[in-house]
Design a protein with these regions (language model features):
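Bacterial Sec-exported substrate-binding components of ABC uptake systems
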Residues: 3-9, 19-73, 178-206, 268, ...
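A local structural motif
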Residues: 57-63, 104-111, 232-243
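Alpha-helical, coiled-coil/dimerization segments enriched in small aliphatic residues
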Residues: 216-246
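Extracytoplasmic substrate-binding proteins
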Residues: 140, 146-212, 302, 306-322
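A short, structured surface patch at a secondary-structure boundary
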Residues: 72-122
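Proline-aspartate-enriched helix->loop->beta-strand connector
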Residues: 120, 125-133, 149, 254, ...
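Short helix-initiation/N-cap motifs at beta->coil->alpha
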Residues: 53-55, 112-119, 242-251
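Structured C-terminal subdomain patch of bacterial secreted/periplasmic proteins
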Residues: 257-322
Length: 322
């Protein structure tokens, strides 16, 4: 379980030769530039130009129809934009996440294997017309580009706002209207949810992952504005000194923060680890523990994406308004 927690925390911090086919969009890498994008603000027809994080200026002649993702954190965005990919890594893992279960039940994706070891042969068999990944796929960029044109996104700066990744991907695939509609839908949900949580304005909250007996992953305020921001999020209050960015803290540091409520990432084996903690005097003295205010949220609610944010918001509200 410790390995799972480390992977998920890394995700958040990160969150940081063409295959011929008659109906494929024609996409050419023209040159390199330091610009971020040449897309207009509103949805535009094709052809369109996009400049990715490597500085490649890519002209997309037609709207892509067979998209392959080589970074699994981006997959939920494709579902949100009503454009499920044909293939992605770690589909088996994602199928266990509560937020993605309904999407994966309705859409069959070819599993490309591990996020860190993409099955290139299987990807070739898929015959994508566009591959989307992140800068963490740069090591296999040359291999990927022999299969289909590649767009690499720098998701690290985008991960600080759940709206950014949908908007950025929408520029690539021509789904700006879908992105804005889904964003508006979630923004309205957050506004309604914030009103329901007004009785908790004087209480403090922490969002954690139990790494081991001595430390916790802590999900920072800047990384989770949907939970903490008073204008664009639920407006939950963190304890004084709560980290701005996602990282790790000791049990002793958690005791200093002493939140009234703790939302804990639910992963396999968490119940047993909590049982082991019951004998720890520091843990038992926490305000949240004494008050019975330690709650579980499925791990899929901590990945910062638009679907994860919606899932997390709904679960926080459901938990606190039972």
């Amino acid at each position: 379980m410790k390995r799972i927690v480390v992977i998920l925390l890394s995700l958040v911090i990160v969150t940081g030769g063409l295959v011929g086919c008659s109906n494929q969009p024609k996409i050419n890498i023209v040159s390199k530039s330091s610009d971020s994008s040449e897309m207009p603000g509103k949805e535009a027809a094709f052809p369109r130009t996009y400049i990715d994080s490597k500085g490649n200026k890519i002209i997309i002649e037609k709207q892509p129809q067979r998209l392959a993702m080589v970074a699994f954190p981006l997959v939920e965005t494709m579902f949100a934009l009503n454009t499920p990919p044909v293939a992605a890594p770690q589909v088996t893992v994602m199928s266990q996440w509560d937020s993605l279960k309904p999407y994966l039940a309705a859409n069959s994706l070819i599993d490309l294997g591990s996020q860190t070891s993409i099955n290139l042969e299987k990807l070739l068999d898929v015959g994508p017309d566009l591959i989307i990944g992140t800068r963490y796929n740069e090591e296999i960029y040359d291999e990927l580009s022999k299969i289909a044109p590649v767009v690499l996104l720098d998701t690290q700066p985008l991960s600080l706002d759940w709206r950014s990744v949908p908007r950025e991907i929408a520029k690539v695939i021509g789904k700006e209207q879908d992105a804005e509609a889904r964003i508006a839908q979630l923004e309205w949900l957050i506004v309604q949810s914030r009103d329901k949580l007004l009785p908790y304005q004087e209480e403090t909250f922490a969002f954690l992952a139990l790494a081991d007996k001595g430390s916790f992953g802590v999900f920072g305020k800047q990384n989770y504005p949907a939970f903490f921001d008073g204008q664009s999020g639920l407006g939950l209050h963190a304890p004084n000194g709560y980290p701005e960015r996602t990282g790790r803290i000791s049990l002793e540091r958690l005791a200093e923060l002493n939140p009234d409520h703790i939302f804990l990432m639910k992963v396999a084996g968490i119940e047993k680890k909590l049982e082991d903690l019951k004998g720890n005097s520091i843990w038992s003295a926490l305000q949240a523990v004494k008050g019975g205010h330690v709650y579980f949220v499925d791990r899929s609610g901590f990945t910062v994406g638009i679907v994860a944010t919606e899932y997390g918001v709904k679960n926080v509200v459901k938990t606190l308004t039972k």
